């Protein structure tokens, strides 16, 4: 078991859509953080940690980085994770850092675009209306947070700046 520093098991909880970013941006960010001794939790979306265990891991993390990619909102798993992060971080003075990866933050804010991305879930999970409302609200909340808009290939600069900040 990892040692606790300042009451946290992890310095960073990394949330992302594996198919979009795991092999490049998220993987490189994870390695850059780890190489600098920053304790980072990375769930590659393949393990699909159960909800309780994942929520506990979020609670045990000081900071969350949410890598919002073009298909992040098409994953119900990612949206539920996002809602859990925002619920857990609310009122606990924990940082949430959204990273808009190869997409414009206004696309996340846009009800039309968000509606299109979440349309798949509305059709499949019509009986989970409360869950969908919660995840849609979380998506709008994260879009309003200050974060990083990366779509110009300067990812190494982001890794360095974030690691220096941590």
Mark where each language-model region is.
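C-terminal interaction surface of TIR/SEFIR-family domains
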Residues: 1-12, 20-24, 103-166
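Amphipathic helical hotspot of TIR/SEFIR-family domains
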Residues: 56, 60, 67-109, 117-118
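Short, flexible/disordered secondary-structure transition segments
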Residues: 40, 75, 96, 149-150
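Disulfide-bonded cysteines in secreted/extracellular proteins and peptides
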Residues: 13-15, 78, 88, 124
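Structured beta-strand/turn binding interfaces of compact recognition modules in eukaryotic regulators
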Residues: 15-19, 36, 43-45, 67-70, ...
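Alpha-helix boundary recognition
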Residues: 34, 59, 86, 140-143
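A general alpha-helical scaffold signature found inside nucleotide-binding enzyme cores
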Residues: 28, 80-83, 130, 134
